[in-house]
Structure formats: C-alpha cells, structure tokens
UniProtKB/Swiss-Prot annotation:
GO cellular component, one term: extracellular region
GO BP terms in the entry: lipid catabolic process
Lineage per the UniProt record: Eukaryota, Metazoa, Chordata, Craniata, Vertebrata
Cellular localization per UniProt: Secreted
Top-level taxon of origin: Eukaryota
Gene for this chain: LIPF
Protein's recorded name: Gastric triacylglycerol lipase
Leader peptide range in chain numbering: 1-19
Catalytic reaction list: a triacylglycerol + H2O = a diacylglycerol + a fatty acid + H(+); 1,2,3-tri-(9Z-octadecenoyl)-glycerol + H2O = 1,2-di-(9Z-octadecenoyl)-sn-glycerol + (9Z)-octadecenoate + H(+); 1,2,3-trioctanoylglycerol + H2O = 1,2-dioctanoyl-sn-glycerol + octanoate + H(+)
Length: 397
C-alpha cells in the first residue's frame, strides 16, 4: 500500500511532467487479460469458472499444451499453479515464454492450470453477494484453503480425468497448501508433489511492510482500510503500469516500489517487463485477509483467524482461541525453494517450517533472491524452474 501512495504522491507533485520523459517501448500484455496474455505468445488458452462450496466464482485458466506439441496424443500430467498474496494467474506468465513457469511447463509436456484466489481481479463473483457488500469480503486465507483450493483441484481433476496433480504454490499459495493438505487427508491424496516457492507459514521474523501494518491498532486499521477490499486493482494501477512505469526516468521509482515490499535484487529484475508487473499487480484481497496476516505477525503463530473475543472464537472453532495449524500432519511430498533476501518469508521462519515437514524431498536456499524473484527473476529458470521440471519428470518414470 505504501509504495502505491508514494507513487501517487509523486505523480501529483510532478503534474503532467512525466508525459515529456523518455518513453520505453510498451509491452502489449500490460493491457491484456489472462487469456489474451496466453494467446499472445501462441499458446492455447481456456478459461473456466469454478464455483466453491460457499458460492465464490473463481476464474481458472488452462494452457493444455505447448506451442509445438499440440498433436501429441494422450493425457498430459497436470500441474496447478497457485499465486501468492495480492497476486493472480498473471504472475506465472508475465515474462517472456522462456522465463515464465506457466509457458515452460506447457512446452515441457504438461497440462497447466493457473488458479485465482477469491477477491483478486479475476475472482470477484459470487452466487449471492455483490463485491460491493461487506459479506463478499468476509474471508481470509482460511477460506482459500478450506474452499478455493479443494474446489479448484477437484474441478481440474474432473475435467482432465486424472486422479492426481502436481501443485506449485508461491507465497500465500504455499500457505493455503499447508493448511489444506494438513487438514484434509482426502485432498492431500490428490497431490503428487507440492512445490513450494518462497514458502510462508509463520511470519514471526518477517521484515516486510506487514510489520508496519501490525503496529496499527485494530480499530484504527478498520477505520483506515474499511471492511471490504484491500489493495484493489483499479484503473490507477493499469495507468501506472502502462504509462508511468514505461518512462525511462520513472522506471527506477516503480522498481524500488516493488522491492520495498519484498527485498532488493537489482541484477535479476527485468526492467523491460516492469509495465506488465505493475499493470497486473497488486490484484487485491480482502481487508480481513490482511488482518489475518497482521495477526500472524503479532502472534508469531501459524493459526486460524482470530475473531477478536473468546465467545466469537467459540462460535467458529468450538474453542476460545484460534486453532493452530499442525504442519506435521501434512504427508504430501514437498520440495522447497527459499531465499536469503526475502523480507516476507524470512529464513528463520523458513527454518521453523522445514523442521515441521515430515516428507521433505528437496530444499534449496538461493543467495540474494527475494520474494518476487521466484516468479519474475531473469535467472528463475536456471535457479528454480528447470529443477521443478526435473523433479516432475521423475514421476513419469
């Protein structure tokens, strides 16, 4: 939130001066939706709508095969990619095909599905509630794990006729995986391997801007941010991405705005794609979800949402305090990639997480990587993606 406010203030102070600054060639994907971004590079694209048990309608995107293997008959192994906090399906296809995990997996022979969590740009529909109502936004990552993930996985498996899939999560995408697979053995059985990028469970040691949010008293937090959407993806973000961040003089401001959230990594950031990143991010979430992360910073625990009073927790959980999520109960094989310069998924929190995983098959800590490098770094294929493809290939043998 803070980087956006700084950027807006900068525009206000500068007036229309930025119009006279040097222009970088714009990437057309900055003005596209998910299907258009996929098709732009010559890949097949499908959009499906998943209805969760509690009525949310999520757009899920499919790349059924790569550009050059359309005629290969037979089922392809299924991979489901789940974005992180404030992200969307675009996170997996925002770079050139050779640098985007969604495209790389399709070209490697996989049936690729891109998920969206309730409340982001591509998941703002409900059977009964309008996004204008507070009821629509009454959710956190608890509900994403309880409803979104199972509904989406079951939909994908029904559609493809397969019994299991590979699950790749980034950031909050790993969080909901940890919850869902540890609390639902039936769902866990449908996962071949869990590939966790920048994994987040506890955030006791985080150095991200969540620390600043945690300092705001609860009552003041609700006054400032309301009770609906946090960090909406609006015309302003697209304007910043398409117009402002494609100016040579201002692209450094945009880059540092992103790094302020996640940690600095100058050598890996592809400045030529900055307008695409900013145009599609942040994709939004609920204020309640942000409150849940704020609670996690303050408590240092990996637990369900605290409703604020013992009697309220009793109503939801049949106990006066929020239940702790038991990471040791997850038996899904898991491969982990973490970063030593990650302000959100701090190495100390990652170490705690690793100590609780009963079926860890691989771990790699990448020097100088930050939280967003796992989806946008120019060397992500060498550091992460090729290893994911190799591990998945083992399942084919």
């Amino acid at each position: 939130m803070w980087w956006l406010l700084v950027t807006v203030c900068f525009i206000h102070m500068s007036g229309n001066a930025f119009c006279f600054l040097g222009k970088i060639a714009k990437n057309p994907e900055a003005s596209m939706n998910v299907s258009q971004m996929i098709s732009y590079w010559g890949y097949p694209s499908e959009m499906h709508k998943v209805i969760t048990a509690d009525g949310y309608i999520l757009q899920v995107y499919r790349i059924p095969h790569g550009k050059n293997n359309a005629n290969h008959l037979g089922q392809r192994p299924v991979v489901f990619l789940q974005h992180g906090l404030l992200g969307s399906a675009t996170n997996w296809i925002s770079n050139l095909p050779k640098n985007s995990l969604g495209f790389l997996l399709a070209d490697a022979g996989y049936d690729v599905w891109l998920g969206n969590s309730r409340g982001n740009t591509w998941a703002q529909e409900h059977l009964y509630y309008s996004p204008d109502s507070p009821e629509f936004w009454a959710f956190s990552f608890d509900e994403m794990a309880e409803y979104d993930l199972p509904s989406t996985i079951d939909f994908i498996l029904r559609r493809t006729g397969q019994k299991k899939l590979h699950y790749v999560g980034h950031s909050q995408g790993t969080t909901i995986g940890f919850i869902a697979f540890s609390t639902s053995p039936t769902l866990a059985e449908k996962i071949k391997v869990f590939y966790a990028l920048a994994p987040v469970a506890t955030v006791k040691y985080t150095k991200s801007l969540f620390n600043k949010l945690a300092l705001i008293p609860h009552f003041l937090f609700k006054i400032i941010f309301g009770d609906k959407m946090f960090y909406p993806h609006t015309f302003l973000e697209q304007f910043l991405g398409v117009e402002m961040c494609s100016r040579e003089t201002l692209d450094v401001l945009c880059k540092n705005a992103l790094f302020a959230i996640t940690g600095v990594d100058n050598k890996n950031f592809n400045m030529s794609r900055l307008d695409v990143y900013i145009a599609h991010n942040p994709a939004g979430t609920s204020v309640q979800n942000t409150l849940h992360w704020r609670q996690a910073v303050k408590s240092g625990k990996f637990q369900a949402f605290d409703w604020g009073a013992p009697y309220q927790n009793l109503m939801h959980y049949h106990q006066p305090t929020p239940p702790i999520y038991n990471l040791t109960a997850m038996n899904v094989p898991i491969a982990v990639w973490s970063a030593d310069n990650d302000l959100l998924a701090d190495p100390q929190d990652v170490d705690f997480l690793l100590s609780k995983l009963s079926n860890l098959i691989y771990h790699k800590e990448i020097p100088n990587y930050n939280h967003l490098d796992f989806i946008w770094a120019m060397d992500a294929p060498q550091e992460v993606y090729n290893e994911i493809v190799s591990l998945m290939a083992e399942d084919k043998k």
